[in-house]
């Protein structure tokens, strides 16, 4: 009987994950990417105490979302006191130490108090060529995106609080500070749009439905497989019982029925030896018991003539399909297995019950081959026959 293959686990889940991965990798599904540029900020001023020029440069700025990405330079101007450092008022006036006439200058204001747009417009009214916003103190050295749509063609960047406050204090002391703004590194920041979230949610739900359907199918297959295995185990148990009813015989030393030098087992291809236990099949072929029993459990047929042993014994199929054990063609009162004759116990009883006159008339007769009392022997299909006068029953 061909073995049923157990359903492989994990195939449906892998297919569902592949569908989800394909959905996420489709062009345009990822939502989009935020592009922004860092700014190189360099400052230069003369230290009044040492009369030395101090110069520093760092990539510490970030261009605003609506800012022009161009280079700008000029003296730094801050809101004139007592105006707040945020520079939110439309009429805010700026002071830039060292500025001459219409020379370009850069407005430096603090974050907070109003929108970025209001700060940029207030500085643009004073003809600032660029606006620098320094971040809040709580944010430390970080910079953040700035939204200032509608401010026109003006350069707007954000710098960190420590850097901005350092420049602001220098300007308030009346020290001219020259600032140069240059384009830094281009950055791409991925983000997922709302449409992409919906698409991923649909893909995930689809994956869950596929996985659930596969799990249902898998467990149905597993249930059927377990049931078939349970049936096969019961099948083997019944087959073992039937095989156990086949007659056994122990080979004896000097036994005329078996030539130990010529006879061999067709399963293991070895000669029969004294004290070997052999199994006798309905087809009269004999084999080692330890060889033929496992064979019959798997094949049910004689290795030599292919007779279905189980059916031949009448223990297989529906009751109406049950076959009777065929009567082997042998002499009445014995079953011939090769050269081996196994005498029926019923015939022995018949011999013992014969009248004395029959014995006297028959004359001396040869002793019959009898099995040991402990051996399991059987007459397979042989009909009972009446003893005849003048002959010996063997």
UniProtKB/Swiss-Prot annotation:
A Pfam short name: PA
Disordered: annotated span: 321-394
Protein name from the UniProt record: E3 ubiquitin-protein ligase RNF149
Keywords of the record: Glycoprotein, Membrane, Metal-binding, Phosphoprotein, Signal, Transferase, Transmembrane, Transmembrane helix, Ubl conjugation pathway, Zinc, Zinc-finger
Gene name of the record: Rnf149
One GO CC term on file: membrane
EC number, UniProt record: 2.3.2.27
GO BP term (any one): protein ubiquitination
SUPFAM superfamilies per record: PA domain, RING/U-box
Functional summary from the UniProt entry: E3 ubiquitin-protein ligase. Ubiquitinates BRAF, inducing its proteasomal degradation.
Zinc finger (RING-type): 265-306
UniProt xrefs under Gene3D superfamilies: 3.50.30.30, Zinc/RING finger domain, C3HC4 (zinc finger)
Catalytic activity as recorded in UniProt: S-ubiquitinyl-[E2 ubiquitin-conjugating enzyme]-L-cysteine + [acceptor protein]-L-lysine = [E2 ubiquitin-conjugating enzyme]-L-cysteine + N(6)-ubiquitinyl-[acceptor protein]-L-lysine
Domain notes: The RING-type zinc finger domain mediates binding to an E2 ubiquitin-conjugating enzyme.
Entry-listed glycosylation sites: 51, 141, 339
Bilayer topology: Single-pass membrane protein
Low complexity bias spans: 352-362
Subcellular location: Membrane
GO molecular function: ubiquitin protein ligase activity; zinc ion binding
Entry-annotated residues carrying Phosphothreonine: 327
Region forming the signal peptide: 1-31
Domain PA residues, every copy: 66-171
Pathway: Protein modification; protein ubiquitination
């Amino acid at each position: 009987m061909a073995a049923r293959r157990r359903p492989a686990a994990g195939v449906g889940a892998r297919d569902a994950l592949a569908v989800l991965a394909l959905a996420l990798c489709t062009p345009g599904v990822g939502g989009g990417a935020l592009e922004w540029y860092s700014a190189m900020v360099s400052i230069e001023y003369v230290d009044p105490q040492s009369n030395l020029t101090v110069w520093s440069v760092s990539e510490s700025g970030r261009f605003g979302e609506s800012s022009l990405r161009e280079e700008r330079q000029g003296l730094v101007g801050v809101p004139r006191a007592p105006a707040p450092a945020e520079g939110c008022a439309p009429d805010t006036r700026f002071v830039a130490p060292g500025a001459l006439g219409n020379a370009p200058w850069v407005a430096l204001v603090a974050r907070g108090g109003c929108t970025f747009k209001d700060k940029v417009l207030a500085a643009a009214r004073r003809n600032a060529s660029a606006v620098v916003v320094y971040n809040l103190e709580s944010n430390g050295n970080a910079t953040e995106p700035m939204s200032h749509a509608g401010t026109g063609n003006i350069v707007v960047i954000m710098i960190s609080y420590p850097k901005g406050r350092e420049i602001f204090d220098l300007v308030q002391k009346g020290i001219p500070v020259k600032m140069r703004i240059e384009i830094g590194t281009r950055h791409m920041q991925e983000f997922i749009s709302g449409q992409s979230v919906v698409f991923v949610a649909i893909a995930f739900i689809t994956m869950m439905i596929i996985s659930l359907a596969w799990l249902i199918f898998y467990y149905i297959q597993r249930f059927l497989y377990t049931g078939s295995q349970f049936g096969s185990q019961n099948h083997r148990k019944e087959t073992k019982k039937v095989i156990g009813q086949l007659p056994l015989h122990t080979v004896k030393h000097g036994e005329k029925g078996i030539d130990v030098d010529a006879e061999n087992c067709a399963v293991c291809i070895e000669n029969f030896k004294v004290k070997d236990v052999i199994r006798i099949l309905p087809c009269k072929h004999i084999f080692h018991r330890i060889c033929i029993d496992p064979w019959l459990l798997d094949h049910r047929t004689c290795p030599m003539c292919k007779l279905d042993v189980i059916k031949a014994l009448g223990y297989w199929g529906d009751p109406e399909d049950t076959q009777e054990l065929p009567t082997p063609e042998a002499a009445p009162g014995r079953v011939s297995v090769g050269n081996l004759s196994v005498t029926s116990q019923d015939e022995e009883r018949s011999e013992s019950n014969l009248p004395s006159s029959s014995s006297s008339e028959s004359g001396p007769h040869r002793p019959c081959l009898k099995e040991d009392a402990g051996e399991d022997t059987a007459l397979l299909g042989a009909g009972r026959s009446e003893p005849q006068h003048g002959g010996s029953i063997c």
